[in-house]
Amino acid sequence: VGMFGDFQVDATDFLHPGRNVVVVKVTRDISGAAAQTSDAMENYYSSVRKDVEDNKNDQRANRKVLTDIPHGFYGDNPAGIWQPVKLVISNPLKVEDVFIKPTLDGASMDITVKNHSARKKNFDIRVDIVDKQTGETLYGAPVLTKLALTANGENMYTCSIDGLKPKLWEPTTPNLYDFRISVTESKGKVADCLTVTSGFRTFKSKDGFLYLNGRKFWMRGGNHIPFAICPNDSILADKFMQLMKAGNVQSTRTHTTPWNELWVSAADRNGIAISFEGTWSWLMIHSTPIPDKNVLDLWSSEWLRVMKKYRNHPSVFFWTVNNEMKFYDLDADMERSKEKFRIVSDVVKGMRELDPTRPVCFDSNYLHSKALRRFGQDFLNTVDDGDIDDNHAYYNWYDFSLFRFFNGEFQKQFKSPGRPLISQEMSTGYPNAETGHPTRSYQLIHQNPYSLIGYEAYDWADPMHFLKVQSFITGELAETLRRTNEQVSGIMHFAYMTWFRQCYNYKNIQPYPTYYAMQRAMQPVLVSAELWGRNLYAGEKLHTRIYVVNDSEDGRDLLPMALNWSIVDEKGKILASGTEQFPAVEYYGRKYIEPAIVMPSVLPSDKMNVKLKLVLVENGQTLSQNEYDLILANKRWNIAKVSENKKIVLLDKDNTSAVLDFLQVKYQKASSVKELVQIKRKADLCIISGLKECTDDEKTLLRTYQQKGGKLLLLNSKEIAKKVYPEHITGWIIPTEGDIVVMERDDAPVFDGIGVLDLRYFNNNKREIPLACHATLKANRNENVTELAGQMKIHAYIDGGKPEDRIQKIESMRGLTLLQIKDGKGTATVSTLCTEKADTDPIAGKLLVND
């Protein structure tokens, strides 16, 4: 029977008046095969991240792990009765099922009636529709009369009601009605009455968008939520969904396992729109063999029963077949991949027959455009691949900086004409449920958090470091996806329940910072700043675009507005402020202006953490508010901080002289390495900047100079560093991003005045990824090398293999951006940091003067 669908047993012949004992035997295997172990779950989970060639010879993908019943993410071989059981006692003439297909002014209904008696029954069908909150009757009348069923007969009857003016169901206004369907026999005697709680709403896929009640609808989503941990906790269900609504999140996905009646009904009450996902994540993934027919039949029949169970719930907006089956991308056998496609397509066709009122997502992570490239249009014409495209992405967590998506790249890469594009899994990392540190497997096995915050990722550090950075990337990504993707229909950010401490306990649950970042990012009307670099000098203009995104919950156009901005310190004191006029914005539209925002000219402290605050006002009413962290510094924090008595010689190949001039650093120019090290009076510091090559003689000159006590500073001269110090520097990596650098030794003098999380998003007043480094150096760690700062590529899982293999993979993705080399009596500091931004970024400037 499976794990999630309803089933019924007619026990009439087995029960008798008085006390009855009902015994149910539950078995945990199918066709005599052993239960699937959690190892199979791990195989599925890891294979999501494999390429086609990696999958084609997967020896673990054997039939044994595919001969179990679908059980979602539950990997502990669950067995037993876990959903409510009820005994129904009725008259022989009984309403067996009702399917309500609502419109905006009524509904059509499929009503199934069965006559369990041994003689013919004549009857009428009456429908009463009652407002669940007020008790007011919206409609009440017979809809079908003079009907008859023969002995043991069953039939489905269809009726339509229109011309009503119901309160519509939307996430903002989750209006519910009790639909009471009665069968009445002679003289109006009610033989049976079935009450179904539902609502009036439509949800459609049309012209490449999603429409709720006739207007475009952007899903402001977060998933998953803690159903699977606490499936029978009604208080938690209501509490969590109310927190979601307060956080401006109005949609989710039933990820990991289908929900039960308790949680779906809570979504109906609280106004949470649902993508209802199927029972078998990773079914037929990559090059796994196709399961036996009886297993597939069990899966498909149970899934259709699940759909039938929940299709009257207004919160269920669309159906998603499964999670990340991905055979369409990853099966190395093209013919087998097509056969898998046809199997799922047949299920989609069955879904449409069972529920023609809702869109279908073929698979959570399926993109029509990718299937088109692989299979061709002729094949796709023979299958049904659903309505909705869904791209899973882990930006700034597994791959890519969020700044790569500031110009609508998401829709440019993934939108197919005529199909709504969403993401049901936009992940940015996971705090644990107790302290807020990164979850253990990512922290220790995969090392993803290290890429973001270095050694602050581990349990000895303050968890607020991870919580702060994780909230930043989550909120910023959510905002940019809304700002620049007018062709997209919504994003569900992942994993929503990890944004709370003790998400499983309704008494103790507390939001983490990401909740509040997303509360701002998910405002229906969103005022949002496009910010690249995050560090500025006092008195400088903030180069930004301020957007307004109009997903107003009443679907209206916005009138011209006022944008109030302010720069405030950590105590809320306003340091600068102003007002700009903002034009009208149509519903589902977005516009931007480039305001004249100037930082305060003088700061009370030389370096300050401040916020840019935005308030959007229409006709005196505040529509949206937002805030962004910035670092500001007085120019005097860096200017003239190097002693005039310090003799500095500069070999300049990349205009570093302009930066030193800005910092009022006195220096003498040299035109060659020879001149650099043979100045008549020995220099306190020799700087080489932007030099790409040198001769063997020049290499010797530099090493000799250092050995005798000379001090060198190599700025963005990686080629020279490798040649001069081959025993210490073996190569370099050009980062895919380079916008985050982490400290190796936060107590080093070079970091005086710089916070442990400050080495990121260096500002140059340009609309480009705000690099903090240009390269990472591969260095041999030894007693003569002092590691100061490093960078690690944003990366996905580090799976399998021996410890040595894992270490090798980690080392292949990381290196040093700042190090010091001792040789003889002298030292050399080698930097790939973006210190050329010192005249626009105070952190870059402080690094340079500290060197």
Where are these regions (language model features)?
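Substrate-binding/catalytic cleft of secreted carbohydrate-active enzymes
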Residues: 238-239, 251-509
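Extracellular ligand-binding/catalytic regions of CAZymes and related secreted enzymes
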Residues: 501, 505-514, 538, 563, ...
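Aromatic-Pro/Gly-enriched surface loop or interdomain linker
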Residues: 607-609, 621-689, 716-719, 727-741, ...
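A glycine-rich, often tryptophan-bearing local segment used as a flexible ligand/cofactor-contacting loop or short
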Residues: 692-773
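Beta-strand-rich binding/interaction modules
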Residues: 107-147, 541-583, 591-596, 607-617
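Accessory beta-strand-rich segments of carbohydrate-active enzymes
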Residues: 1-94, 117, 136, 258-261, ...
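Extended acidic/polar, glycine-enriched regions
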Residues: 14-19, 112-206, 604-636
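N-terminal carbohydrate-binding accessory modules
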Residues: 180-245, 265, 630, 639
